[in-house]
Amino acid sequence: MDEERSSMLPTMAAGPNSILFAINIDNKDLNGQSKFAPTVSDLLKESTQNVTLLKESTQGVSSVFREITASSAISILIKPEQETDPLPVVSRNVSADAKCKKERKKKKQVTNIISFDDEEDEQNSGDMFKKTPGAGESSEDNSDHSSVNIMSAFESPFGPNSNGSQSSNSWKIDSLSLNREFGYQKLDVKSIDDEDVDENEDDVYGNSSGRKHRGHSESPEKNGAHSVTQAGVQWHDLSSLQPLPPGFK
């Protein structure tokens, strides 16, 4: 009974060493402290085991240091290469070329827009000229017609049968054609009054020229000059009239 109680005591005791007393294993190293004193062989074994453990630990630490130094050396070598790398210069040139291309595209687009606007303005102006009501002719045609009529009015007094009555009639016909056929604005009242005065004076000059032909024979050159003065009376004011010859009464 005492042996059984003594075997039960280690199980109730606290601490890991108490369990080793109750368990008996074939391996002596695991049985814990033996009752006998340790021999020299046991001490040598333990020392060799400790040495091997130290070697393994030192090898592991050395391998770790080697890996760290290798990684740090690689990082140090990579950094200066990146600083001296010519790639950033190439990227700047490429960016400058891209900017130049963008500016050229913008300039081209602006010119195209201006050309389109000009075409639209020309089309609109053409439509406006087509839509404007009138006599069916452009301003250039009307100006041509008016210039032809005025030249005919100038040329009529210098014809072979140039008299004051004929020139006045031609002026009336031209004025009617300008006022009725081509739809121009009518002449002012002042110009009409001046024309009436000119016609009366032309009649007076015509009668006087008839008397001169009866009394005195004059050359055709003088008649031509007289008709020129009559044409000048039609187109100019009374102040531009030539004085009468001294033989006229």
Swiss-Prot record:
Question: Could you say which protein family the record assigns here?
Answer: Belongs to the sorting nexin family.
Name the gene behind this protein. Answer: SNX29P2
Q: Where is this region: Disordered?
A: 109-171, 188-249
* Feature: compositional bias, Acidic residues: 193-204
Q: Where is the composition biased (Low complexity)?
A: 156-170
**Could you tell me what this protein is called?**
Putative protein SNX29P2
Q: Where is the composition biased (Polar residues)?
A: 226-242
